[in-house]
UniProtKB/Swiss-Prot annotation:
Assembly and binders: Heterotrimer of A, B and C subunits.
A GO CC term assigned to this protein in UniProt: glutamyl-tRNA(Gln) amidotransferase complex
The protein's name: Glutamyl-tRNA(Gln) amidotransferase subunit A
UniProt GO molecular function: ATP binding; glutaminyl-tRNA synthase (glutamine-hydrolyzing) activity
InterPro entries: Amidase (IPR000120), Amidase_CS (IPR020556), Amidase_dom (IPR023631), AS_sf (IPR036928), GatA (IPR004412)
Active site residues according to the UniProt entry: 57, 132, 156
Gene responsible for this protein: gatA
Presence of keyword Transmembrane: no
Species: Methanocaldococcus jannaschii (strain ATCC 43067 / DSM 2661 / JAL-1 / JCM 10045 / NBRC 100440)
Length: 434
């Protein structure tokens, strides 16, 4: 049964992946051998992920697979160990079928900056799939797997989930171990699921979460359960609504009516620091990314990153290098850290009396594949997703319709460590939309 399912998925990958470029490494013999072992293991049948076929973003270590981060820098580097999340997946009966494409070193929100070529959006082939977890979202959307892992630094799970019409979830900072993740910005990064249903997002989050001594930011949390959301106070932030295009705003307003029908109370909120989101996020991102890339010096892991990387990666390294210097760090980086505290404190304050916040995931529809955007135009896609990373919130995306065939995702955000509420709201909304 499991072997048969793996073979079916391998056939689909063979037929479809050439076109959409969602996966950059597949080892049929390896996954079939693991499937045969799993099928013979009677005890494994009781495991929660038994036989689930999973794709993993190319910045997460899976032993024996290349961990390239979709860059020439690491194109020949084979992961020597499993990341904590991969250990947990394997322990619970999951099968890794392949490695997903992504924006190079997670620098991008379009899926176009990969050394291995851009990923196409299975739901709108002339449009970007979003990024940086482009391949993970596209693989789930094109039914090349049951579920996938991505990472989210400023929207990198939620952005492609919205564009590709799938479910994505960024757990609260500290819920999931990042041991074995090649970080973009360590104070923002979280690993999370991309799935076909919100129930599956809950399932996979429960498997991968938990305290890990190898990641000191992690905390132990009780298993997340599906709760009744009747009576929830649902916040709607005026400034978040104002940023979104009119057509996307219409979809969100219809989604708000669904929550009313589910017995929720709608509460209007105001957040005065929306304008600080992008500069705060990117200044911290640049500095942390520059710091994390110093290991790619051409002596230990592969090529020297500055000599072979793409334009966006080089831009971030150069800016990060500049603002890390003593004469600039006080002017830019330290001010960004102050702004981060302002944003976080204000967010916690406005969320005090609500259970969740709902709104748009991205302010506009995905642009056309190959369309030239300035860096600021590209960064603007992140304006509604970066606040969750800056403030340590949990945040998920669930499909809420489409505009001319292009999917639109509803973003649901919750207070730190109230992941259960967000996942419950995602499940309830998805069921109401069926």
């Amino acid at each position: 049964m499991i072997v048969e399912r793996v073979e079916e998925y391998l056939d689909r990958i063979e037929k479809i992946n050439k076109d959409i470029n969602a996966l950059i490494e597949v080892k049929p013999e390896k996954v079939l051998e693991e499937a045969k072992k799993l099928e013979k293991d009677e005890k494994a049948k009781k495991k929660p992920l038994y036989g689930k076929i999973i794709v993993v973003k190319a910045n997460i270590n899976v032993e024996g697979y290349t961990i390239s981060c979709a860059s020439k820098t690491l194109e020949n580097y084979i992961a020597p160990y499993d990341a904590t999340v991969i250990e947990k997946i394997k322990e619970n009966g999951g099968l890794i079928i392949g490695i997903a494409n992504m924006d190079e070193f997670a620098c991008g929100s379009s899926g176009e900056t990969s050394y291995f070529g851009p990923t196409k959006n299975p739901r709108a082939k002339d449009r970007i799939p979003g990024g940086s977890s482009s391949g993970s979202a596209a693989a789930v959307s094109a039914d090349l797997c049951d579920m996938a892992l991505g990472s989210d630094t400023g929207g990198s799970i939620r952005n492609p989930a919205s564009h590709c019409g799938v479910v994505g979830f960024k757990p609260s900072y500290g819920v999931v171990s990042r041991y074995g993740l090649c970080d973009l910005a360590m104070s923002f990064d979280q690993i999370g699921p991309l799935t076909k249903t919100a129930e599956d997002a809950l399932l996979l989050t429960n498997i991968i979460k938990g305290k890990d001594l190898r990641d000191t930011t992690t905390v132990e949390t009780k298993p997340f359960e599906k709760k009744d959301i009747k009576g929830f106070k649902v916040g709607v932030v005026k400034e978040f609504m104002d940023v979104a295009d009119e057509k996307i705003r219409d979809k969100v307003e219809k989604a708000i009516e669904v929550f009313k029908d589910l017995g929720c109370e709608i509460v209007e909120l105001s957040y005065k620091y929306v304008d600080l989101a992008l500069p705060t996020y990117y200044l911290i991102n640049y500095v942390e990314f520059f710091s994390s890339t110093r290991r790619y010096d051409g002596r230990r892991y592969g090529y020297k990153i500055e000599e072979v990387c793409g334009e966006e990666v080089l831009r971030r390294i150069m800016i990060g290098s500049m603002i890390s210097q003593k004469e600039y760090s006080g002017k830019y980086y330290k001010n960004a850290l102050k702004a981060r505290n302002l944003m976080r404190n204000e967010m916690i304050k406005i969320m005090k009396d609500v259970d969740i916040i709902v709104g748009a995931t991205v302010p506009k529809l995905p642009h056309k594949l190959g369309e030239k955007l300035t860096p600021m135009e590209m960064y603007s896609y992140d304006v509604l997703t970066v606040p969750a990373n800056i403030c340590g919130l949990c945040a998920g995306v669930v499909p809420c319709g489409d505009i001319n065939g292009i999917p639109v995702g509803l973003q649901i955000q919750g207070k730190p460590f109230e992941d259960e509420k967000v996942l419950s709201a995602m499940i309830a909304f998805e069921k109401a939309m069926e």
